[in-house]
From Swiss-Prot:
In-chain residues carrying the UniProt-annotated modification 3-methylthioaspartic acid: D89
Family according to the record: Belongs to the universal ribosomal protein uS12 family.
BP GO terms, sorted: translation
SUPFAM superfamilies in the cross-refs: Nucleic acid-binding proteins
NCBIfam families: rpsL_bact
Matches recorded under InterPro entries: NA-bd_OB-fold, Ribosomal_uS12, Ribosomal_uS12_bac
Example of a GO MF term: tRNA binding
Pfam families: Ribosom_S12_S23
Domain of life: Bacteria
Annotated GO CC locations: small ribosomal subunit
Annotated protein name in UniProt: Small ribosomal subunit protein uS12
Oligomer and partners: Part of the 30S ribosomal subunit. Contacts proteins S8 and S17. May interact with IF1 in the 30S initiation complex.
Residues modified as N6-acetyllysine: K108
Amino acid sequence: MATVNQLVRKPRARKVAKSNVPALEACPQKRGVCTRVYTTTPRKPNSALRKVCRVRLTNGFEVTSYIGGEGHNLQEHSVILIRGGRVKDLPGVRYHTVRGALDCSGVKDRKQARSKYGVKRPKA
């Protein structure tokens, strides 16, 4: 335990919080260009072909972003928007692609949770 005198001379150091999404640089979203679109397999015990893409961001970072929803129209050189949010069973994937923004289309025939997949309200 430090004495009062020691604390007067040198106050306690504050802990610095480390960001989970460093490439966003404290922004809500960032724009980038797909450099590679591919599928990868999740960690045990899950099994699937998860759709992901490598993205070169406007700030120079290159990150891996998950493409949520069923089906997508992304290919190399597509301009997309990414947001934070990791995918628990894909190591190294800390970002999500925003569906329905820029070159990334919304999910076709989506009826529920539409706002998460960039789908407009269907005609009644």
